[in-house]
Amino acid sequence: MSDRIGLFAGSFDPVTNGHVDIIRRASGLFDKLYVGLFYNKDKTGLFEPARRQIMLKEALGDLKNVEVVAARDSLAVDIARQHQVTHLVRGLRNAQDLEYEANLAFFNSQLAKEIETVFLLTALDYRYFSSSRIRELIHFGADISPYVPQGVVKEVGKKCENKQKI
């Protein structure tokens, strides 16, 4: 039997505890799990991709079968093919996510029939977490420590100390 290889793609700006939970759970389902750090043309970034990659690696360092890969101008299915991925992993928080993700899964299946999409329901504790909401909290100086890995809290602190625009 061939290896089961997953790809969980996102912009992770910033990575949240909800992302980490999905990745941890997905890592148990696959022999190898790639976490694809993608550029989302529809989102305004808070952190540079290189900084996001560092934060992801720090948050996931104990997961031996997980590797973070960066992809700027690529489709997830193209990166999946490069890494012999068998399954795309997507997290679902609510019905709105399902509608969006079902549409994405349809197009991915049209582009790469050999790659299956699997959905993991977000744990109840993380159901309302989103990177965009975290960015809003950061903008207004709220405490984000309950929602993100400690490395993200530290990076936000550095940005604030350096008086960089948030």
UniProtKB/Swiss-Prot annotation:
Cell compartments where the protein resides: Cytoplasm
One GO BP: coenzyme A biosynthetic process
EC numbers on record: 2.7.7.3
UniProt GO cellular component terms: cytoplasm
Binding-site residues, ATP: 11-12, 19, 91-93, 101, 126-132
Site positions for Transition state stabilizer: 19
Ligand binding (substrate): 11, 43, 76, 90
Top-level enzyme category: transferase
Cofactor: Mg(2+)
Top-level lineage group: Bacteria
Subunit structure of this chain's protein: Homohexamer.
Function noted in UniProt: Reversibly transfers an adenylyl group from ATP to 4'-phosphopantetheine, yielding dephospho-CoA (dPCoA) and pyrophosphate.
PANTHER family documented for this protein: PHOSPHOPANTETHEINE ADENYLYLTRANSFERASE (PTHR21342:SF1)
Protein name from the UniProt record: Phosphopantetheine adenylyltransferase
Organism listed in the record: Streptococcus mutans serotype c (strain ATCC 700610 / UA159)
